[in-house]
Design a protein with these regions (language model features):
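Positively charged N-terminal leader segments that act as targeting/secretion signals
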Residues: 24-37
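Switch I (G2) and immediately adjacent beta-strands of P-loop GTPase domains
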Residues: 114-118, 310-337
């Protein structure tokens, strides 16, 4: 590896002096590129300011790129985003006021027209951002044009025909990463924000974008590096401790383990806020499932009728359960029927409950508990929130009798019993809380200040936690200090994978290929 690195640097120096194209140099040195004058080193290469494996051969640093950054749908405005070396100069060639654009300071806006030869394409406002004070760390421009898809594409086509290349997925954010404008936790948070379904999901991703996870990882790394430094001093200048366990203070390592454990435990809860949960509404016919479905959605999606068997197929929709994204299913009522279509719907209901994270089982409080209810609940495979519906039409004595009857059945899968009125909207807060309590049981701190944002991050934190734990075991067993040092160095490298200071090229490709074009 050192030979390859040395050879790559020689190639870079040789071809750079010849003003050789970086893309061609990429091919010659086997995909390894040294990026000139970058302040952040994703691979922690100390012999140059920045060295990165490009995750996609089409990702060429500094090459002028452009992409539509807004949805291709009728709108008041559309934006075409551009970045790269010379992008302002290139844009000036198709701009009606080239001198004003070339002289524009960073964080300024210039009015004019995009032109194709002598033809005016659209009246635009151009936002100018100068390196390094831009999202990518390069010179950037954003062309704000009228938002019709035809107009936006026409503006982009003019740019593509005048020196710009179509940006790849995530290429703008990738350039921000290699130019030190964002670590990997922030880059991944950008995509999380785009994909967030609720305000709480967005808030958690914004926290990572603001740097709370990076700061937590940096704090843990400092604990490890401080301990590592003290051990290395002991190796160089040994004293007379009887055992290795006595030769250094392990309090920082124990604190690192505590904080790594909290981070590791946070992922299951954070994953729920990203991916959402599957919640299935079921119960006997006319229990009020469709009414509850419509009430939660705040729209009439499901047909509501007093006629039994109205719902024969299932409906689904994403909803906000107190900040948690939930994929909610309304299903056919459970009953024995000779109607072939309805019977198929009942079978689909049972299949959906097998894949659910939580079952919301509705029972009409005025009708009470039936043998069919009990039989279904005893066979349930997933946790159940049992909902007595129509409490607005159920007197207190009957409600108490119903609750006692349910408790006497002692059904294992029922985790919560609540009372609601789908018609009046009563008990919805308790309903959301019950579902969340079940889902977050055993997931660590639901309100973690710095939670993990991806499975990749969790894997790296798990490895770091294992290495730190092993270092303490090694010290307790009186292994050589070099063994402890190796464990701590491994842990620091694993944490570097979280932030991107140590990351393989295939990992980068996996991360940035998930982004939309223009981000």
């Amino acid at each position: 590896m050192r030979f390859l690195l040395f050879f790559s640097i020689l190639c870079y120096d040789f071809f750079y002096r010849l003003d050789f194209n970086l893309a061609e140099m990429n091919k010659i040195v086997g995909g390894f590129a040294i990026c000139k004058e970058l302040g952040f080193c994703p691979y922690n290469l100390k012999i140059c300011k920045s060295g990165v494996f490009m995750p996609d051969p089409k990702y060429v640093p500094e090459e002028p790129i452009c992409a539509v950054a807004t949805a291709l749908a009728p709108a008041a405005l559309g934006i075409v985003r551009c970045t790269g070396k010379g992008c302002v100069s290139l844009l000036s060639k198709v701009f009606s006021r080239p001198a004003a654009l070339l002289q524009a300071a960073g964080n300024s806006i210039v009015y004019g027209w995009i032109k194709n030869g002598g033809a005016k394409i659209d009246e635009v406002m151009v936002s100018v951002f100068r390196a390094p004070k831009s999202f990518t760390g390069e010179d950037m421009v954003e062309v704000s044009c009228h938002g019709g898809p035809g107009v936006v594409m026409a503006v982009q086509n003019v740019l593509l025909n005048n020196g710009f290349r179509q940006a790849e997925r995530g290429e703008f954010t990738f350039r921000a990463f290699i130019n030190g404008k964002a670590d990997l936790t922030k880059a991944e948070a950008v995509q999380e924000i785009i994909e967030s379904r609720t305000g709480e999901s967005r808030s958690r991703a914004v926290g990572r974008l603001a740097g709370n996870l990076f700061e937590e990882i940096s704090g843990i790394k400092k604990l490890l590096t401080d301990t590592l430094a003290s051990i290395e001093v002991e190796i160089e200048y040994p004293e007379d401790e009887e055992t290795i366990a006595d030769s250094f203070d392990r309090s920082d390592l124990q604190e690192a383990i505590r904080r790594l454990s909290e981070l590791n435990d946070s992922w299951q809860g954070e994953k729920l806020y990203q991916d959402g949960a599957r919640v299935v509404l079921c119960g006997r016919t006319n229990a009020g499932k469709s009414s509850l479905f419509n009430a939660i959605l705040k729209e009439d999606r499901a047909i509501v009728s007093d006629i039994e068997g109205t719902t024969r197929d299932w409906l689904e929709s994403w909803v906000d359960f107190g900040g948690l994204p939930v994929r909610l299913f309304d299903t056919a009522g459970l009953r024995e029927t000779e109607d072939v279509i309805e019977a198929h719907g009942v079978e689909l209901t049972k299949n959906l409950t097998e894949d659910a994270d939580v079952i919301l089982y509705l029972c009409d409080g005025a009708s009470g508990l039936s043998k069919d209810d009990v039989d279904f609940l005893r066979n349930a495979e997933k946790p159940v929130v049992f909902c007595w519906n129509k409490i607005d039409a159920t007197d207190a004595a009957l409600a108490e009798k119903n609750s006692l009857a349910l408790k006497n059945e002692n059904i294992e899968k029922i985790k919560k019993e609540i009372k609601i009125s789908a018609k009046k909207g009563n008990g919805f807060s308790e309903l959301y809380g019950a579902v969340k309590e079940i889902l977050f049981s055993g997931t660590g701190n639901e309100r973690a200040q710095a939670g993990l944002g991806s499975a990749r991050q969790k894997l790296a934190v798990e490895e770091a936690l294992e290495s730190v734990s092993h270092s303490i075991v090694a010290a307790d067993k009186d292994f050589a200090l070099d063994a402890v040092v190796q464990d701590l160095e491994d842990a620091i490298d694993f944490l570097g994978e979280v932030t991107g200071e140590v990351t393989a090229d295939d990992v980068l490709e996996s991360i940035f290929s998930r982004f939309c074009v223009g981000k």
